[in-house]
Amino acid sequence: MAKGHRSQIKRERNAQKDTRPSAKLSYARVSVQKACFVLDAIRGKDVQTALGILEYNPRYASSLIKKLLESAINNGMNTENLYIAECYANKGPTMKRVKPRAQGRAYRIEKRMSHITIVLDEKK
């Protein structure tokens, strides 16, 4: 447990806060593995190049990530020299569904979700 007065603890916590423009999409209906294919293609690229890659990528996750990237760009102040510093997908909850099969059997279908985060930074 941290020592000190409550206001001092809050001041220290706010001083360490990350001020880079970012955006997070929670409970995206795409698996982490499929989202990472698209995220690996844009990691480290500048914003305009990444938007071009996402525009012509046929995967479903690219449309979600494109909207998320545009949101992160709007959170930033200077949009000319932004690049993607971090982008990652974390595992979310899994919806369990039942698919009827032959001879009275039932298979379980797992519909996976993910939490996708994009953090931008300015080139120096």
Regions found by a protein language model. Give the residues of each.
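Short acidic (Asp/Glu) patches
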Residues: 38, 100-103
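Ribosome large-subunit tunnel/peptidyl-transferase-proximal elements
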Residues: 2-89, 115-123
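Generic structural "secondary-structure junction" signal
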Residues: 27, 32, 97-100, 109-111
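Short, flexible micro-motifs
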Residues: 47, 95, 107
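A short, conserved strand-capping beta-turn/loop at the end of a beta strand
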Residues: 89-101
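C-terminal edge-of-domain segments
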Residues: 102-124
